[in-house]
Swiss-Prot record:
Gene: Ostf1
Species the sequence originates in: Rattus norvegicus
Protein name: Osteoclast-stimulating factor 1
Residue span(s) of domain SH3: 12-71
Modified residues (Phosphothreonine): 200
Modified residues (Phosphoserine): 202, 213
Top-level taxonomic group: Eukaryota
Note on domains (UniProt): The SH3 domain mediates interaction with SMN1.
Molecular function, one GO term: SH3 domain binding
Keywords: Acetylation, ANK repeat, Cytoplasm, Phosphoprotein, Repeat, SH3 domain
Gene3D superfamilies linked: Ankyrin repeat-containing domain, SH3 Domains
SMART domains for this protein: ANK, SH3
Amino acid sequence: MSKPPPKPVKPGQVKVFRALYTFEPRTPDELYFEEGDIIYITDMSDTSWWKGTCKGRTGLIPSNYVAEQAESIDNPLHEAAKRGNLSWLRECLDNRVGVNGLDKAGSTALYWACHGGHKDIVEVLFTQPNVELNQQNKLGDTALHAAAWKGYADIVQLLLAKGARTDLRNNEKKLALDMATNAACASLLKKKQATDGARTLSNAEDYLDDEDSD
């Protein structure tokens, strides 16, 4: 009986490493990579040979080589977002690194993109169908809190247009509006809160009207 094919790796389970040395393949199945290259490991079902991708090429790598001769990158998407490194971010997403993964602070890559003012990164993350806008980190801050606090009105506008919530409070009970450090951010947030408030009021009135008509 032939061995069943390995299960596909779920997004977010991809392991990412930076090669410390160049690896010269001995067979056509093996993956060539150079010192400093980023390697995405997608299949670790075989304990001896792992399947990986590097610079768009896929092949096998001895697992002991990766363990001993490569440096693990725990949150590559976060690192790319923090640095504003668009090409690396795209590469991570292409290699199925999970878009909503959390770092030790409980923050997403989107949070760090907003914190750093990297609008182009935010726009690419928004192309991911399941991107989580309202994830709160260990301090209770969302991506909207970060953008407002750092004063990036263009990013605040992007987040609001995408549907980010303005009513979430952090651990200090502060809304994104309370964190806004400039008038442009505050104005956008006030306007959105007023719109949301009016919509909530309208929904409540509709509900009461429906009850009256029963």
